[in-house]
């Protein structure tokens, strides 16, 4: 009651892709709003300060742009903020080259994944200064922040699972074989919101349908 899930929390599948992610996210969000509008969440207490802090955080990219645009001396590149498209291009390059993208023939390994995590951490630092010139770009800015966090999660899980579980989707060049003895399991993670560090663990797979 009052818990809404999307993505792997409602059933893991390798074929969900981005379209499945945003579709399930939209469905979960609309269901949560309906839950609130129907007064089912009336026991949840939120202070005025919490609301104001949340609004300030959400609209910060608009402020970053308003201040930073005055420092532009030519073109559209600012020394004090990053635009959503600039951040997106960096994110795509990191995931493509270090986490088994098409230009790497879907191949990655321990060292590449660790370097990818380092570059993702740098990007997340820079996204604290993402700028948005209008509400559409504000949406893009937050979409980028969430995509970067999702990418970090994908990279952490790929590094933790020491095998190639999905040949064709990605390959661990240093762990090319399927290892059912050690890795016929689910991997779950918890992210510390204060430190950004992930804690990884294995969970058993329960087959509810016979393989035969």
Q: Residue locations for each model-derived region?
A:
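Glycine- and aromatic-enriched mobile tails/lids
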Residues: 1-212
